[in-house]
């Protein structure tokens, strides 16, 4: 029998917000059912309209605030209500941190079935103009005869939010978005550029133009003039990721750089490489991870998901040896390059399938006293399942997804005999619901 789709009640409703969801939406209880409302804060009475009715929950659109929360602030960005780049600008920065810390501890309790012996003070940074990496969509609109440059709309990702500024982006891009739009408006093939990747180092900013067709000579000239006038490195991407090349300056090397001044280390990276988006927070995160490791001169450390050596190289200055393992061969090459340029010799790097600990052990036949894990959002499930084969006394786990951290914590604590000593959040992405966290496990 065909299911009858519930009809939307389009009349406005009033409800009190009782909590926040993991993605920062307000939660109201209407007739005993959870209703998620973007932009609403706990304690507020809001007027809303249903946008989706499901079996277990509903979703609604915020129409007005009847009783505002004392936690509410005026968003700095004029595009905030539509743009999908942020989700928490209406909440004070201090409350954002409290929300993220509470969310982490709740997940560790609910899914990790444990709680840390102590809670780390949150790591924070400047919460404007922090974002050094981003992907901007572009589209030339025939009706308007103008180009849209921006992030996808929050409520309809098929569409682009046309923005003139972005206060979370690197300050140079923040002020130059208008000029980017004007550049594409003047090109002969206005439909050629599908997106623009932004990557900033400490001293340079690179733009990667995804060109769907070969550029005309005139368009190449316009891009060169733009890059020269506004001082950008420009890369073109005519195909897949391996097609990216440095277009301007034509004689320039392809790398940007960032520094960890406390360790006198400079990293070079390609604009396509994975690097942390928030340079200030990254410096604090590396220092906290090393402090939690309590490294000794005799320690041999395993750095899993090591990337270009962001943790490996500074750790190597405090221990006997670091072995870094990474799934991406290009990043392993980059890690070796950075070790060499910084004259760090007590490190080795390997490419391996990090879902197969036995493959890692076959490459690295040594004992490790300590392990650092910095996995992608999917977490480190296979590693923690097989952690016995490594048998470290101490594990520092850097996480970009608190749900998978909680899952892996459950295994480490309740199956493998580790104790969760401490944990806390690191606000890598202010004004978003994204939660970066760090946890320390000690063998029981």
Swiss-Prot record:
**In the Enzyme Commission scheme, what number(s) does this protein have?**
2.1.1.190
Chain positions recorded as [4Fe-4S] cluster binding sites: 77, 83, 86, 166
Q: Which reaction does it catalyse?
A: uridine(1939) in 23S rRNA + S-adenosyl-L-methionine = 5-methyluridine(1939) in 23S rRNA + S-adenosyl-L-homocysteine + H(+)
Catalytic positions are 400 (nucleophile)
Keyword list (alphabetical) reads: 4Fe-4S, Iron, Iron-sulfur, Metal-binding, Methyltransferase, rRNA processing, S-adenosyl-L-methionine, Transferase
| Keyword hit for Transmembrane helix | no
Xref: PANTHER family: 23S RRNA (URACIL(1939)-C(5))-METHYLTRANSFERASE RLMD, RNA M5U METHYLTRANSFERASE
- Supply the name of the protein: 23S rRNA (uracil(1939)-C(5))-methyltransferase RlmD
The species this protein belongs to is Legionella pneumophila (strain Paris)
């Amino acid at each position: 029998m065909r299911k009858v789709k519930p009809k939307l009640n389009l009349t406005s409703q009033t409800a009190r917000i009782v909590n926040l969801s993991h993605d920062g939406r307000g939660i109201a209880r209407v007739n005993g059912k959870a209703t998620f409302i973007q932009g609403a804060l706990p304690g507020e009475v809001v007027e809303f309209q249903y946008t989706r009715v499901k079996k277990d929950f509903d979703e609604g659109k915020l129409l007005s605030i009847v009783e505002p929360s004392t936690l509410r602030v005026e968003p700095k960005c004029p595009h905030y209500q539509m743009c999908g780049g942020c989700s928490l600008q209406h909440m004070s920065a201090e409350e954002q941190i409290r929300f993220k810390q509470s969310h982490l501890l709740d997940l560790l309790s609910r899914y990790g079935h444990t709680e840390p012996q102590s809670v780390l003070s949150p790591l924070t940074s400047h919460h404007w103009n922090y974002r050094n990496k981003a992907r901007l969509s572009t589209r030339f609109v025939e009706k308007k005869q103008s180009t849209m440059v921006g992030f996808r709309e929050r409520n309809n990702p098929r569409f682009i939010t046309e923005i003139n500024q972005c206060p979370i982006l690197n300050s140079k891009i923040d002020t130059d978005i208008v000029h980017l739009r004007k550049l594409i408006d003047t090109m002969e093939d206005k439909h050629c550029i599908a997106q623009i990747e932004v990557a900033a180092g400490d001293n340079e900013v690179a733009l990667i133009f995804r060109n769907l067709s070969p550029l005309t000579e005139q368009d190449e000239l316009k891009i060169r003039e733009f890059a020269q006038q506004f001082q950008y490195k420009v890369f073109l991407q005519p195909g897949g990721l391996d097609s990216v090349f440095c277009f301007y300056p034509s004689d320039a090397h392809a790398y940007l750089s960032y520094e960890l001044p406390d360790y006198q280390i400079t990293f070079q990276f390609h604009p396509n490489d994975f690097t942390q988006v928030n340079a200030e927070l990254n410096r604090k995160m590396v220092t906290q991870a090393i402090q939690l490791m309590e490294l000794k001169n005799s320690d041999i450390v395993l750095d899993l998901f090591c990337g270009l050596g962001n943790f490996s190289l500074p750790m190597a200055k405090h221990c006997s040896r670091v072995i870094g393992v990474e799934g991406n061969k290009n990043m392993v090459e980059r890690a070796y390059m950075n070790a060499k340029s910084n004259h760090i010799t007590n490190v080795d790097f390997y490419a391996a399938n990090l879902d197969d600990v036995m493959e890692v052990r076959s490459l690295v036949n040594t004992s490790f006293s300590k392990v650092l894990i910095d996995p992608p959002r999917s977490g480190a499930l296979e590693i923690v399942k097989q952690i016995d084969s490594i048998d470290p006394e101490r594990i520092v786990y850097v996480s970009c997804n608190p749900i998978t951290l909680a899952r892996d914590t459950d295994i480490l604590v309740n199956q493998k005999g580790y104790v969760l000593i401490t944990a806390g959040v690191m606000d890598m992405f202010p004004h978003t619901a994204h939660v970066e966290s760090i946890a320390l496990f000690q063998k029981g």
